[in-house]
Amino acid sequence: MASLTDLINLDLSDTTDKFIAEYIWIDAVGGLRSKARTLSGPVDDPTKLPKWNFDGSSTGQGPGDDSEVIIYPQAIFKDPFRRGNHILVMCDTYTPAGEPIPTNKRCNAAKIFSHPDVAAEVPWFGIEQEYTLLKKEVNCPIGCPTGGYPGPQGPYYCGIGADKAFGRDIVDAHYKACLYAGINISGINGEVMPGQWEFQVGPAVGISAGDELWVARYILERITEIAGVVVSLDPKPIPGDWNGAGAHTNYSTKSMRNEGGFEIIKKAIAKLETKHAQHIAAYGEGNERRLTGKHETASIHKFSWGVANRGASVRVGRDTEKEGKGYFEDRRPASNMEPYVVTSMIAETTIL
């Protein structure tokens, strides 16, 4: 008799040309939802996939008497769970009349990235997504002793060993699954707090940075579901003398990457300073608990920048200063930030 694992891993390619498409969307509180459908294929162009719908009253995105929300396929990735020709589909959300619903942040971001002035600058983003793995039964990072606290931070950052690195199997599974899916995941590392990790997505151009980060988050949620662990994107999951969790956003334009780009970078940083309050308001919930001026953060109340300064709002790398061109890092976004909002806002502020 076939086991459950055997059935889950069934290869359908020899018996049917049908494939499974997992449609993914963002709900009312910034969580991820998904459901699957059977299609004939294969398909590698999202415009050739059918639109679909879901019950918005069950996701906080529509009233019960008019609950249908339409999901538009926007980006396709290979499915690392079902494998074969099966796909993950990142979608955004609309009314039946074709208007983006309020929680659809991708639509406005796509408009900004399609602006001729923005498109001409070919904006690159690299996002450092920090997250914390928590025990399912209690709100405590994995690696915490039952009824107690781990030793102070210091040995956990890029640490190895059973007393320093907790959850590496999840991290490596996620790393490989993202590569399989076609996400440009560029690395992983253990972070400063026990049970805290980081993966990096990018460089990615324009709207694709948001698509790739959201699907990477989805894959992480699915893997932790299998492992029986909870993934938290809270910017300060554990109060006290512990680092928070951010989503540092590295950014460059064509002009910044060319000769003389450092001067363009400094002008862009000056523009960010003039809109510090607006950016902070859009950079994630609970960020005031993280941006305290301690634990490698700048104060939420004051904009600052510097070369190699991880206590600044914006950091410029030594290599960029030395070469006179390159990129900068906006260190303000929280781990739970909306990547469509953050990336498009940075581009809009610095280019338009």
Curated annotation (Swiss-Prot):
Catalytic activity: L-glutamate + NH4(+) + ATP = L-glutamine + ADP + phosphate + H(+)
Any Gene Ontology CC annotation: cytoplasm
Membrane-crossing segments per the record: none
Gene3D superfamilies: Glutamine synthetase, N-terminal domain, Glutamine synthetase/guanido kinase, catalytic domain
Enzyme Commission number(s) of this protein: 6.3.1.2
SMART domains, A to Z: Gln-synt_C (SM01230)
Protein name: Glutamine synthetase cytosolic isozyme
